[in-house]
């Protein structure tokens, strides 16, 4: 049997399921090789590090980048423990809501908590990422431009109360003809490879 996590308010998942038998049951379900899916908040909750939306809203890229370590970037962890998503920060509605900037900030905040490099995985609304037990993943899309974006972390330490500073942020696009390898973030046959300064 598969389990599908609905969209909605992801802070409720964090508040009501973290550290409970429900969270443990989801982990056991995945460890048993059974499928776990989700959309919107239900996908955002699956990474090792995640935006918990504990600030009561939905963070936008300019505000997230203005203070990546700030309190509004409510990055949570210790929710689900999915091996293929270890070291990954997940985000949704990616291209549609211009969330590249916020995912970069979320990765930076997650790295400040983890003390190690992380990667970001942003998924567009018209796409799904299906991850096999060995971590290989494929993108399925209902729109020709939809897919997933990997943000490579390993950023320099960010300063408290200061805007994001990164001389180079590497991103890689995965589409239906790509193979994504998790948790490494390597993409075979990428749709694009782009670099940004923030």
Model-based region annotation:
Residues 10-11, 43-46, 128-130:
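Short, active-site-adjacent cap segments at secondary-structure transitions
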Residues 50-52, 56-198:
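C-terminal and late-domain segments of enzyme folds
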Residues 10-20:
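Glycine/threonine-rich flexible loop motifs
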Residues 19-33:
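Catalytic-core regions built around general acid/base machinery
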Residues 13-14, 47, 54:
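Glycine/Thr-rich phosphate-binding loops of Rossmann-like dinucleotide-binding domains
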Residues 2-4:
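N-terminal Rossmann-like NAD(P) cofactor-binding module of classical short-chain dehydrogenase/reductase
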Residues 6, 30-50:
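Catalytic nucleophile loop
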């Amino acid at each position: 049997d598969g389990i599908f996590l609905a969209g909605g308010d992801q802070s409720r998942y964090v508040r009501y399921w973290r550290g409970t038998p429900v969270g443990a049951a989801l982990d056991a379900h995945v460890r048993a090789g059974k499928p776990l899916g989700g959309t919107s908040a239900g996908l955002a909750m699956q990474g090792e590090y995640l935006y918990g939306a504990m600030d009561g809203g939905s963070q936008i890229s300019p505000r997230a980048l203005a203070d990546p370590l700030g309190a509004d970037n409510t990055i949570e962890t210790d929710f689900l423990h999915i091996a293929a998503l270890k070291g990954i920060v997940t985000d949704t509605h990616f291209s549609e809501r211009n969330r590249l900037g916020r995912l970069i900030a979320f990765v930076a905040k997650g790295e400040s908590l983890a003390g190690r490099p992380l990667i970001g995985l942003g998924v567009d609304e018209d796409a799904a990422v299906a991850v096999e037990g060995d971590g290989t993943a494929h993108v399925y899309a209902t729109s020709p431009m939809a897919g997933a974006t990997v943000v490579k972390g390993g950023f320099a330490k960010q300063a408290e109360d200061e805007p994001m500073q990164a001389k180079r942020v590497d991103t890689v696009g995965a589409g239906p003809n790509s193979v994504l390898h998790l948790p490494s973030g390597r993409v075979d046959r990428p749709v694009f490879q782009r670099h940004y300064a923030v």
